Curated annotation (Swiss-Prot):
Leader sequence residues: none
BP term (GO), one: G protein-coupled receptor signaling pathway
UniProt organism field: Caenorhabditis briggsae
UniProt subunit comment: G proteins are composed of 3 units, alpha, beta and gamma. Interacts with gpb-1 and gpb-2.
Propeptide: 60-62
Gene3D superfamilies per the UniProt record, alphabetical: Transducin (heterotrimeric G protein), gamma chain
Membrane-related topology note: Lipid-anchor
The protein, known as: Guanine nucleotide-binding protein subunit gamma
Keyword line: Cell membrane, Lipoprotein, Membrane, Methylation, Prenylation, Transducer
Pfam families according to UniProt: G-gamma
Length: 62
């Protein structure tokens, strides 16, 4: 019975959450990414000089 009460309470809480349209939120997300892309590593990626995962280039003589 306790499980049903907990589930009911959770569902009521979720039902009261104010929702926004995906089209509005997507526009806000794109604006945020464009505004912060110069400093956001997840958007622009690391600089090649500071990327520890980049393969080391070696000099080969033919």
């Amino acid at each position: 019975m306790e499980n049903i009460k907990t589930t009911t309470e959770q569902l009521r809480t979720e039902a009261n959450i104010q929702r926004k349209k995906v089209s509005e939120v997507a526009k806000d997300l794109v604006e945020f990414c464009e505004k912060n892309k110069a400093t956001d590593m997840l958007v622009s990626g690391p600089l090649d000089a500071h990327n520890p995962f980049q393969e080391k280039k070696s000099c080969s003589v033919l």
